[in-house]
Amino acid sequence: MQNEQYASMKKNTVDSRNQLGKDPCVRFDTYNGTGPRVLFLGNSITLHSPRPEVGWHDDWGMAASCEENDYVHLLKAAVRELHPDAAFCVCQAADWETVYQTGSEMMGRYSEAREFGADIIIMRLIENCPGLHFDGDVFKQELHRLLSFLNPDGKAQVILTTGFWHHPGDGAIIDYGRKQSLPIVELGDLGEDDSMKAIGLFEHSGVANHPGDLGMKMIAERIFSVMKTYL
């Protein structure tokens, strides 16, 4: 039963290491904006630099058809309708996921995201955490340290999400969110629906199993339904 539950997760064969090449893991959009400051903390679904060897030639959330259609840019557009002067930061932390057990050792590379001074943090991490022998207690401990690092004065509202594909760590995220009184956006059902993926659009099966435009739209809509309360 467990193997069936996580079958979609196992189709994510995109290497979790070095997803950005030599590109920076922290990027900004309208850094000096005077409106709400939104930080996206994520992985390849949030941002993946070009990787021609798997047929991915773009520099946005895998596997949207264009920049405007990934969930980050859809949320940016929705926020800007309310606050045209909003500021945004993307912190791509797939490397943290792969070694979450010792994730604290990696936090220094995210210092620029810490200095951004976020008002809202969208936590979109779990998919690249190794599912075999996943340690929920260690994950919660390290996630808390990471979020505390990115939110040093505690002013930011953190919004948690579960995996796009069902993951053994989803329960740890939900438990952490409940104990910290944080909103949780569940996404795992999307990864069970091939219409939410980029199936048939990429030869590499791992890329194709990432969210396509419809999946990205659904991710953005679910997050914004919670996020708008804090704008």
Give the location of each predicted region.
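N-terminal secretory targeting modules
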Residues: M1-L41, I45-A64, R80-E81, E115, ...
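Residue-identity detector for glutamine
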Residues: Q2-Q5, Q19, Q92, Q101, ...
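Short linear motifs at secondary-structure transitions and domain/linker junctions
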Residues: K11-N18, C66, W96-V99, V158-T161
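Conserved SGNH/GDSL esterase-like catalytic core that processes O-acyl groups on lipids
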Residues: P24-L39, L47-H133
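Alpha-helical cap/lid subdomain in secreted, periplasmic
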Residues: N69, L74, E81, G103-L231
